[in-house]
């Protein structure tokens, strides 16, 4: 009779591999989470810059920014409330309004607290006036 040679991994070998994978995961996952937060902030910065450029084009055509009441929607749809724009572009100034990376609409104040217009995301917490707000007045803090 011949002895059959069994092949496979022992329980100890499998456990060692699982422990090593766990250690690697504990090192990699926090880094990925930090990168997601940074990527979300960078998207908000890019969106705010694009919205600010569109608002500048609106002002060039109409000699004024939209009011706070007209809001950023004035970039997509011609405002009907006073002051109505005198020279509104066909198709608006952007195709659609983006949402911030956390699923909230961007906000605009005209006149702003920090400049002629303030464009901002309320950040991850969704509340205005907190440290995670990203606005056209503090973009350098997030770059």
From Swiss-Prot:
InterPro entries: Bac_GSPG_pilin, N_methyl_site, Pilin-like, T2SS_protein-GspG_C, T4P/T2SS_Core, Type2_sec_GspG. It is found in: Cell inner membrane. Belongs to the GSP G family. It comes from Aeromonas hydrophila. It is a single-pass membrane protein. Core component of the type II secretion system required for the energy-dependent secretion of extracellular factors such as proteases and toxins from the periplasm. Pseudopilin (pilin-like) protein that polymerizes to form the pseudopilus. Further polymerization triggers pseudopilus growth. The gene is exeG. The keyword Transmembrane helix applies. Type II secretion system is composed of four main components: the outer membrane complex, the inner membrane complex, the cytoplasmic secretion ATPase and the periplasm-spanning pseudopilus. Forms homomultimers. The keyword Transport applies. Pfam families: N_methyl (PF07963), T2SSG (PF08334). PROSITE patterns: PROKAR_NTER_METHYL. This is Type II secretion system core protein G. Keywords: Cell inner membrane, Cell membrane, Membrane, Methylation, Protein transport, Transmembrane, Transmembrane helix, Transport. Residues 70-92 are annotated as: Disordered. NCBIfam families: IV_pilin_GFxxxE, typeII_sec_gspG.
């Amino acid at each position: 009779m011949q002895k059959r040679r069994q092949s496979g991994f022992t329980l100890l070998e499998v456990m060692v591999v699982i422990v090593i994978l766990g250690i690697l995961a504990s090192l990699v996952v926090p880094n990925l989470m930090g990168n997601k937060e940074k990527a979300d902030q960078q998207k908000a910065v890019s969106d705010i810059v694009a919205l600010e450029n569109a608002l500048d084009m609106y002002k060039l055509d109409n000699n004024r920014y939209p009011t706070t009441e007209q809001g950023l929607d004035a970039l997509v749809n011609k405002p009907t409330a006073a002051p109505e724009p005198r020279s509104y572009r066909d198709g608006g100034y952007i195709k659609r309004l983006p949402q911030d990376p956390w699923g909230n609409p961007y906000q605009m104040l005209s006149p702003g607290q920090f400049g002629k217009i303030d464009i901002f995301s309320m950040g991850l917490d969704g509340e205005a006036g907190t440290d995670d707000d990203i606005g056209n007045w503090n973009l350098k803090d997030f770059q």
